[in-house]
């Protein structure tokens, strides 16, 4: 965890923004895989980490904006716990380490909430994403589980988005630590991408690198020859010479800040000319996005400019036709680029996505676009210094989507389907960097993973 003053300052700032009421911050409990004692890898709730910093199950935080008092609710371990799990600091000592003086047994949260309800105090919480947290809030608040989701505090969400979007220097350092691990994961994958090796062997190796650095992976690894599937978690295929693999993988730092990178690697060390033609369009799109990022720009506008770069490159190859700006305005590029350019990143790989992307990636000025493709853009709002974002353009040839568009004559005016059909077995290419928005532009976080085709080929050959 960080210095206790970091968490005290964050809670004080949140209390000031909220003005009044109590804020409920439940930590995550253990999640069983197949019986109670056999659990999934534990991951603390990111809001709890941000405000209270303690990385263990069985805790509940409360911030009282009326009195200025913060409390951590939890139970000290028993002798049975010590026998099986070893000794641990007391709840009081843990709380003191993050600047909290008040502690109480876990069950005492019920009487505290009852007292607040009796006094007519506003009770704020983030809409839960775990069923057990929803049931706990249902019991605490005395409302139906369906009402728990409906009654999440929009005021709390907006204030936390404001705070967490602008990264502190200590947070940026954590993200760069995760980026360094991510670098090692990706260059290892490049070196292992040989014909005959199984995808799962590479995936297992790079996930091991993340675990060896202490934090583990920041999301399930995507590593596949079938890159036409955007989030392909199947690692069951043997690598074939002449094909490409997409590796979309990242790590968490020990304090749970994320990295998220994607590279596309030629199996056997050499891109074909067809692959290189598409790769260079995606690389140009990636570099264009980085050059356009600066405070005051909307990420929606950058996404659309990148879409024009992709459409223009595909037009040069004879895959698209017509006016490029008109094609993008009509969403024709989304046949090949059917997702958004990027998202916020921090304590979550898709930072604060549990708050609702409408509040994290958009605001009253910039609203989501409903058009296919651009509608998947998770971040459209104006950029500010110390935002951390991803930049991940891609081009994919998805047989089912191509068949649908051709059959229904969707954007026929802008697509040369006869030429596109020659790419049906191509797969896909995605290139992703993590960016820090600076006062005047953008900085790629961490050592940039090899991305120019000759660099990638060099790593893959050796």
Residue spans of the language-model regions?
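Active-site neighborhoods and metal-handling regions in enzymes and metal-associated proteins
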Residues: 1-462
């Amino acid at each position: 965890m960080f210095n206790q003053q970091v968490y005290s300052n964050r809670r004080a700032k949140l209390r000031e923004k909220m003005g009044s009421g109590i804020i409920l911050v439940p930590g995550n409990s253990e999640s069983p895989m197949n019986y109670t004692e056999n659990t999934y890898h534990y991951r603390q709730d990111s809001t709890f980490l941000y405000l209270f910093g303690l990385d263990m199950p069985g805790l509940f935080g409360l911030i009282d904006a009326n009195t200025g008092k913060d409390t951590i609710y939890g139970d000290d371990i028993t002798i049975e716990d010590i026998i099986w799990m070893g000794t641990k600091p007391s709840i009081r000592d843990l709380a003191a380490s993050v600047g909290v003086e008040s502690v109480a047994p876990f069950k005492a949260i019920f009487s505290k909430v009852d007292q607040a309800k009796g006094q007519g105090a506003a009770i704020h919480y983030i809409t839960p994403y775990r069923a057990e947290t929803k049931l706990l809030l249902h019991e605490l608040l005395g409302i139906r589980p369906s009402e728990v989701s409906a009654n999440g505090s929009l005021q709390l969400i907006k204030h936390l988005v404001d705070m967490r979007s602008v990264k502190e220097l200590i947070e940026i350092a954590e993200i760069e630590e995760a980026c360094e691990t991510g670098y090692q994961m990706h260059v290892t994958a490049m070196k292992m991408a040989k014909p005959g090796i199984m995808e799962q062997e590479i995936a297992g190796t790079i996930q091991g690198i993340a675990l060896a650095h202490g934090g583990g992976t920041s999301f399930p690894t995507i590593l596949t020859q079938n890159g036409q599937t955007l989030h392909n978690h199947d690692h069951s295929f043997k690598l074939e010479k002449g094909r490409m693999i997409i590796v979309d993988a990242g790590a968490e730092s020990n304090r749970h800040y994320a990295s998220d990178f994607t590279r596309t690697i030629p199996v056997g060390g050499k891109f074909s000319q067809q692959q290189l033609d598409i790769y260079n369009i995606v690389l140009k799109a990636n570099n264009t996005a980085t050059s356009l990022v600066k405070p005051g720009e909307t990420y929606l506008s950058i996404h659309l400019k990148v879409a024009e770069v992709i459409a223009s490159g595909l037009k040069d190859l004879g895959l698209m036709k017509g006016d490029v700006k008109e094609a993008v305005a009509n969403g024709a590029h989304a046949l090949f680029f059917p997702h958004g350019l990027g998202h916020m990143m921090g304590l979550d790989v898709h930072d604060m996505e549990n708050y609702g992307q409408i509040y994290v990636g958009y605001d009253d000025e910039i609203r989501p676009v409903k058009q296919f493709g651009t509608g998947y853009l998770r971040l459209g709002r104006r950029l500010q210094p110390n935002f951390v974002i991803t930049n991940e353009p891609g081009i994919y040839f998805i047989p089912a989507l191509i068949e649908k568009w051709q059959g229904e004559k969707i954007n026929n005016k802008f697509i040369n389907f006869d030429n596109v059909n020659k790419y049906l077995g191509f797969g896909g290419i995605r290139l992703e960097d993590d960016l820090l928005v600076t006062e005047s532009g953008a900085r790629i976080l961490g050592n940039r993973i090899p991305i120019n085709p000759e660099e990638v080929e060099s790593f893959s050959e050796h």
